[in-house]
């Protein structure tokens, strides 16, 4: 199969992280050959207006208003689709700006898609998330939505232990991959854009809308900060609001009284902890 990537990165005030990954890409001879001969392009959507105009051949920077992750990735998809014929783009990779990347992941993804069987060509590929604080620990290989009560495939596994390797590519039950690193066929991207959630759950809804089972392969991964380090009142707002939207879009059957009870529990917990801003954000989310 002929494979050509558009690597889309939505960036907001992560210049140092981003430039470290770009340096790895530009210094990788195999990736530079793909850029020259196979249409490999890196597209950075700059939501903060802080990046240089150019980082070298094959790297595009698109200044953008701060439209959040949803808007930034959507812009990157649009730019990829506009030039798909020029570059022969077959797949779009969506990657966060605050990950640690090894270019080996891109090599393996290219090899996988080059030899994949026809019946799997339209399936997405989920990149694993390894922990930044314990780098040998896989946090997740792919996700199960479960109505918002997330289940992680291969959750918190120490991948230095042999017993954790035997089923590491098992994707049974997987529904989507997070946009720390995920790859979709251009055929799907060209016709589909993320919901305008600003932050959070855009990757959930997009993957569930695709409906395929994401492929998991060892070595296709990034290191990323896990959710316990990323909590804030604003995040609580988007998580609460967007979860309700996703379930409604999917026509998932759920008990509205149960939803209300869980919401009240969150508000009560925030109130008892004197987290007034979080309490306010949770109220606004509903």
Language-model features, listed with the residues they occupy:
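Short, well-formed alpha-helical segments that are part of the catalytic scaffolds
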Residues: 14-33
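A recurrent flexible, glycine/aromatic-enriched loop bordering the glycosyltransferase active site
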Residues: 156-181
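Donor nucleotide-sugar recognition loop
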Residues: 173-181, 190-208, 213-222, 232-235
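Non-catalytic, C-terminal membrane-associated alpha-helical segments of glycosyltransferases
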Residues: 262-286
